[in-house]
Amino acid sequence: MADTDVIQGTLDMLILKSLSLQPMHGFGVTQRIEQISKGVFKVNPGSLLLGFQRLEREGLIDAEWRMSENSRRAKYYSLTSKGRKQLKLDTDDWQRRVAAIARLLEAEA
């Protein structure tokens, strides 16, 4: 795993979180993740596309074609109510796991 790879198993959650802020196209999601992580995470375009397809198939996001900011057709993704619920579950689970790892790392030998 490269230093900038998204942590395995978190891409769907990061996509859902990005879309919870506003509907956006794939490049916008990539930029959002890289911007908020301050460049720590880079998103592979192929992985992102597979993530969108998986989330749409599961009913967690919707997609529609629109004109982008630069007047080009782009597929915009938005969070469904089911997606919002899943994001909450994923976020709670992730925070629980991070707290457990922090406790393990801080434990005295």
Which positions does each model-derived feature cover?
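Short beta-strand/turn micro-motifs at beta-sheet edges
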Residues: 1-5, 65-66
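N-terminal helix-turn-helix DNA-binding core of bacterial DNA-binding proteins
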Residues: 3-47
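Basic amphipathic alpha-helical segments that dock to polyanions
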Residues: 48-55
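Beta-hairpin "wing" of winged helix-turn-helix
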Residues: 56-73, 78
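Accessory beta->alpha helical hairpin/"wing" motif in late/C-terminal subdomains of nucleic-acid enzymes
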Residues: 79-83
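Amphipathic alpha-helical dimerization/coiled-coil segments
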Residues: 85-109
